[in-house]
Amino acid sequence: MAQVYNFSSGPAMLPAEVLKLAQQELCDWHGLGTSVMEISHRGKEFIQVAEEAEQDFRALLNIPSNYKVLFCHGGGRGQFAGIPLNILGDKKVADYVDAGYWAASAVKEAKKYCTPNVIDAKITVDGKRAVKPMSEWQLTPGAAYLHYCPNETIDGIAIDETPNFGDDVIVTADFSSTILSREIDVNRFGVIYAGAQKNIGPAGLTLVIVREDLLGKASVACPSILDYTVLSENDSMFNTPPTFAWYLAGLVFKWLKQQGGVAAMDKINQQKAELLYGVIDNSGFYRNDVAQANRSRMNVPFQLADSALDKLFLEESFAAGLHALKGHRVVGGMRASIYNAMPLDGVKTLTDFMLDFERRHG
């Protein structure tokens, strides 16, 4: 079978080595004669899987000991509710930075629980979409917390600045599409959350990193399944967790450590992004509408000079083993999601195809 590269924004490509190991262990996990999907989440065998996954995740991100790591249900959208329900306390106002589609979605959900002060950070620089620097974000004195999304998968916009608003500002962030792709200073955040289906593992699992002093503040209306304190006190097993997704995430964490950790992935991700953006920028046939300072290294949207060729581009790229390149319906065009599991060879294959397509149709 010819090599296939999956550029889907999520569920996304998983490391081939992880899939092969999961395949080998699927029906007989560690000699038990059963699948890891079938064993009790409270049995010693799965407890070991869970503990190792958390230890490896902590090591990869250098998570301090005063932070809890929760393995949850609900996805990023679940945390759009989970953040205000857990962090708002007796306050009513929270700051929300709007820099794209997912940040706006978080605002919409938050309105059910609080009064969001929406900081519109979207600007235009030399005709391209960009984001205001953090120094220009007008925060509300005494707000319960600040929420933002460091990487917008649909818009292809990234905010790579490290928050530095002082100890009085609780920073919460949706890292779903950029977690583990670059090093971050966890100490600068009160809560970090990430859906697993992009850089962690399969869909169905959500990771939350929460500072311990923020526990115990949940609203009385907060469902127990979203209550960080309940989840922490029950080691993320208040109810049956998504065990197979948890197991696969653990395999991905071990794979990442074998690759050299997050610092090594950061360098590889930079190489992949530079290669793809280089082809786009040096072409009169393709274009990207995001200012260079805010370009995402994970999600690269691009347009063809003639949109009438979009259908042909997608058909030919799919036939060439380059799958899921269709852009989101909101922005159209193409989008290549190049998360950690996408090898450099996959991006090279894509850029070779793009250059050939341009020669034939430009």
UniProtKB/Swiss-Prot annotation:
SUPFAM superfamilies with a match to the protein in the record: PLP-dependent transferases
Keywords noted in UniProt: Amino-acid biosynthesis, Aminotransferase, Cytoplasm, Pyridoxal phosphate, Pyridoxine biosynthesis, Serine biosynthesis, Transferase
Subcellular location: Cytoplasm
Gene3D superfamilies per record: Aspartate Aminotransferase, domain 1, Type I PLP-dependent aspartate aminotransferase-like (Major domain)
N6-(pyridoxal phosphate)lysine: modified positions: K198
InterPro entries reported for this sequence: Aminotrans_V_dom (IPR000192), Aminotrans_V_PyrdxlP_BS (IPR020578), Pser_aminoTfrase (IPR022278), PyrdxlP-dep_Trfase (IPR015424), PyrdxlP-dep_Trfase_major (IPR015421), PyrdxlP-dep_Trfase_small (IPR015422)
A GO cellular component entry from the record: cytoplasm
E.C. number(s) listed in UniProt: 2.6.1.52
One example of a Gene Ontology biological process annotation: L-serine biosynthetic process
Top-level class of the enzyme under EC nomenclature: transferase
Binding site for pyridoxal 5'-phosphate: G76, R77, W102, T153, D174, Q197, N239, T240
Protein's name according to its UniProt entry: Phosphoserine aminotransferase
Origin species: Klebsiella pneumoniae subsp. pneumoniae (strain ATCC 700721 / MGH 78578)
